[in-house]
Amino acid sequence: MPITHKTPVSKTAVNLVDGKVLTVENLTFSYPDGYVALHEIDLALSAGEKVALVGPNGAGKSTLMLHLNGILNGAGELRVGGLPLNKKNIALIRAAVGLVFQNPDDQLFSPTVFEDVAFGPLHMGLPEDEVRTRVEEALAQVGMSGFGERLSHHLSMGQKKRISIATVLSMRPQLLVLDEPSAGLDPRARRSLINLLRDLPITMLVSTHDMALVRELFPRMVIMDEGRVVADGETTILLNDEVLLEKHGLEKP
């Protein structure tokens, strides 16, 4: 397919500070109706960590995730590597933080798989050969090589979820943020997704209600409730704290 170039943005990776990919300090956010969705959130992710974000509906998980690449903007401090999230750095940070929505149909809007996966690199102003290379690499990473000319809306839910992940991997992010990746998948597709997430060599923050997924895949777990981080620690320890889990509407898998 022909590729139309956009104005280039910086393609330099975000430099880490003390090994931290993400630092959130005292983040507070209220919606226009006055509802306070986040209360003084503190969170840090080191390079290579895979962290589960859990909690009941309405805990603030999705609101927090929408702050990580500037879709929402609350009070407090948020840094990706050493860069503060602000208008000056927003393009670089959005390339460094790949956000994958729960519903892949919210992310796949182009006629073909190739065009969906090429969208991000194309809007970075990359040359055509690099765009094609990134698309091929991203599709290979998610086990979807050869699907470039397929129509995105004709794919199964499991395939769409993989393509959604490929759309952000083509940006070569330093942090992958996923919202409910296993939702709506049959057992085979869920197992395939778990294997994919395990094998991807990238820092990850994953919001999920799938506690079996948390136990299997994530060494660290962060629990949110009513807009606050109420626990942050080793998954095995937190999952054995039945009082804590019950208090915050969670069940041991």
Task: Show which residues each predicted segment covers.
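Conserved beta-strand-loop-alpha-helix hinge in the C-terminal portion
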Residues: 228-250
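Conserved ABC ATPase "signature" region
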Residues: 129-147
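Conserved ABC ATPase signature
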Residues: 151-155
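Catalytic Walker B motif of ABC-type/P-loop ATPase nucleotide-binding domains
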Residues: 176-179
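H-loop/switch region of ABC-family ATPase nucleotide-binding domains
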Residues: 208-209
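Conserved ABC transporter NBD signature motif
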Residues: 74-85, 93
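The feature captures the beta-strand-to-loop junction immediately N-terminal to the Walker
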Residues: 54-56
